[in-house]
Amino acid sequence: TGHVVQTYILCRDINPLEASKTGADSTICGDCVMRGTPTTDPVRKIAKNRKCYVNLGQGVLIVWKAFQRGVYKTGSARDMGRGRFVRVGTYGDPAACPASVWEDLLAEADTFTAYSHQSGWRPDIAMQSADTYEQATAHWSEGRRTFRVITGLEDLDKTKETLCPASKEAGRRVQCTACKLCKGSSLAKSIAIVEH
């Protein structure tokens, strides 16, 4: 990704592992199918069949614990984003926050990346996360750009999508900080990446 301001959307009073396991993460991830199924299994630490690429036991949990200890200072979102590259929703869906938060943070940002599983949420800010080709075509018909994980190169729709330039399959030509394709509305093609 490169040097980026990372934003986390977290449950204030429930650690990310517990939020996943109990389903409380719906408040920050909406109806994303990658969340998995809540469980009461005492052996499990997270939801069953969770497919989200974000590892809750690493960065997300560390950030949540630091927040609980009061490590993070408060300040102006506009100042925090000014002249910087911002990753909207490193964890959590940006639709879970008031749009004014993102408007302030991104107002003077150099650029940003953003994705949402919530259909039609702020296409000026976020690319639409599509889990299937059918979902992608539905979003394209509404004029929305998508970000889609594909199982192989043969799944790429070359008329509507391009491979993520930072991906192994595209030769890791550029980091996100230089690419700047993954942000809301633009004339660029939608982005796809082979699952890893």
Feature-to-residue mapping (PLM):
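Class I S-adenosyl-L-methionine
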Residues: 1-196
